[in-house]
C-alpha cells in the first residue's frame, strides 16, 4: 500500500519545470545567440544564491569558456540554458527569446549538450551517435565520429558501428564514452553546443586533436565550454571566471 501510494504521488505530482500553455517559437532564422540578463539562481530551500547577477553574451561563431574552482557553479550555470533548472531572477534568452517562453522540446532541439558524466544508452555505437538525429545519414555519423576522435577505437572493433553498447556504456572506457557523447552532439547539428567539462577523460594528444577538428566544425555555432584544464579553453574568444568568496558566485572577465 505504501509503495502504491508513492507511485500515485509520483504520477500525480507536477513537474518542477513546465512549459507555457501557449509556448512561443524560436524560429528557423535564429543564429543561437545566448544571453544571460542579470541571472541569479538558488536551489529550492537554499538560503543563498549559487549564482548572483550573472550577465554575458555568447555569440554565434565564438567560444565562451567558464573556469573557476570546484563548486563555484559552472555546471549549474550551463544547466540553466536547457532548463534543467529555471532561474530565480533575471532571464536567459536565445536569439532574444526568453527560454521559459519556449517549449522544452524545441529549446533542447537547438542544443548539443555534452554533460560532465557522459551518458550512453543500450544499443549499438550507431544508435548512440545518431540518438539526437535519428534520420541522420551514415556519412553524418562517420563525420561526427571522426571529429570526436572516436573512429580510433570504433575501427578496431569487428562490428564497427554495430558494436553493442551496454546500458550506461559500462563496456567502454571513460574516454571512449566522452568521445561518443561528443560525436552525438556533433551529429545533431545544433545551433548551440554546451560542453560541461566534457574533455576531462581524454589524454592530451586526443584532446588537442579533437578540439582542433571541433573548432572547424563548430565555426558558425555558439559554443559554451566549462573546463578544468586551462589548455582546453585557450582558443576561446571569451573566458569568464566564476569567483566564490564567502558570497554568491559572480563573474569576472
Task: For the regions a language model picked out, list residue spans one by one.
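ABC-type nucleotide-binding domain
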Residues: 12, 19-20, 27-242, 246, ...
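Cytosolic ends of transmembrane helices, especially the final helix of ABC transmembrane type-1 domains
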Residues: 1-10
Amino acid at each position: 500500500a505504501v509503495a502504491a501510494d508513492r507511485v500515485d504521488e509520483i504520477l500525480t505530482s507536477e513537474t518542477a519545470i513546465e512549459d507555457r500553455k501557449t509556448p512561443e517559437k524560436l524560429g528557423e532564422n535564429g543564429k543561437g545567440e545566448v544571453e544571460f540578463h542579470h541571472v541569479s539562481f538558488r536551489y529550492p530551500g537554499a538560503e543563498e544564491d549559487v549564482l548572483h547577477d550573472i550577465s554575458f553574451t555568447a555569440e554565434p561563431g565564438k567560444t565562451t569558456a567558464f573556469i573557476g574552482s570546484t563548486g563555484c557553479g559552472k555546471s549549474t550555470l550551463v544547466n540553466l540554458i536547457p532548463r534543467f533548472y529555471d532561474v530565480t531572477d533575471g532571464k536567459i534568452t536565445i536569439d532574444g527569446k526568453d527560454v521559459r517562453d519556449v517549449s522544452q522540446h524545441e529549446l533542447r532541439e537547438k542544443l548539443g549538450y555534452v554533460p560532465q558524466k557522459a551518458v550512453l544508452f543500450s544499443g549499438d555505437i550507431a544508435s548512440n551517435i545518431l540518438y539526437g538525429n535519428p534520420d541522420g545519414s551514415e556519412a553524418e555519423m562517420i563525420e561526427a565520429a571522426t571529429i570526436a576522435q572516436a573512429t580510433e577505437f570504433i575501427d578496431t572493433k569487428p562490428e564497427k558501428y554495430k558494436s553493442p553498447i551496454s546500458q550506461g556504456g559500462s563496456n567502454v572506457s571513460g574516454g571512449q564514452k566522452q568521445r561518443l557523447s561528443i560525436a552525438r552532439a556533433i551529429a545533431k547539428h545544433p545551433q548551440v553546443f554546451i560542453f560541461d567539462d566534457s574533455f576531462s577523460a581524454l589524454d592530451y594528444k586526443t584532446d588537442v586533436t579533437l578540439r582542433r577538428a571541433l573548432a572547424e566544425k563548430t565555426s558558425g555555432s555558439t559554443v559554451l565550454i566549462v573546463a578544468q584544464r586551462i589548455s582546453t579553453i585557450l582558443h576561446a574568444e571569451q573566458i569568464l571566471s566564476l569567483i566564490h568568496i564567502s558570497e554568491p558566485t559572480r563573474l569576472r572577465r
